[in-house]
């Protein structure tokens, strides 16, 4: 076999359907859009959720709840992510951001207890879960709420 003899596998390449090229093509005249009407026009069609003038579902269903403007969103860090630091390192939100562990500090950093901590660290964060707090102290490290 030579390079010029290479061919695509049978059925792997489908020929593009060219519409409006004569009635015998099967997609001539109206090009598969049916007769007149909104959907036959260029740019035609209805917006998402439109139900033909009937009150749409999202307006028939009552509103519920509200968004609390005072909610705090914390950047979450798990224990196993802290293993990138050397023993005895003081881990602060700024250091976590520099290391690429958190993208933005948001309302502060919360340390969660997923994974296993293998280093002795001093961790400074806004919040700690009970399991994270216990694991850090068990490794001889310390925590500080800031």
Swiss-Prot record:
Gene: rplO
The keyword Repressor is assigned to this record: no
Classification via PROSITE patterns: RIBOSOMAL_L15
Compositional bias (Basic and acidic residues): 1-13
InterPro entries xrefs: Ribosomal_uL15, Ribosomal_uL15/eL18, Ribosomal_uL15/eL18_sf, Ribosomal_uL15_bac-type, Ribosomal_uL15_CS
UniProt protein name: Large ribosomal subunit protein uL15
Similarity comment: Belongs to the universal ribosomal protein uL15 family.
One Gene Ontology term of the molecular function aspect: structural constituent of ribosome
Keyword hit for Cytoplasm: no
Biased segments, Gly residues type: 23-35, 42-51
Cysteine pairs bridged by disulfides in the record: none
Listed GO CC annotations: cytosolic large ribosomal subunit
BP GO terms, sorted: translation
């Amino acid at each position: 076999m030579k390079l010029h003899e290479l061919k695509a596998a049978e059925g792997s390449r489908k020929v593009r359907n060219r519409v409006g090229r004569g009635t015998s093509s099967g997609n001539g005249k109206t090009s598969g859009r049916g007769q007149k009407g909104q959907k036959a026009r260029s740019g035609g069609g209805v917006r998402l959720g439109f139900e033909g003038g009937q009150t749409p579902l999202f307006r028939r269903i009552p509103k519920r709840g509200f968004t609390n403007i005072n909610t705090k969103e914390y950047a979450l860090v798990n224990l196993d992510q802290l293993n990138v630091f050397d023993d005895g390192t003081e881990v602060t939100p700024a250091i976590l951001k520099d290391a690429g562990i958190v993208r933005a500090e948001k309302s502060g950093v919360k340390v969660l207890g997923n994974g296993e901590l293998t280093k002795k660290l001093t961790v400074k964060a806004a919040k700690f879960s009970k399991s994270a707090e216990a694991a850090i102290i068990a490794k001889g490290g310390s925590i500080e709420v800031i």
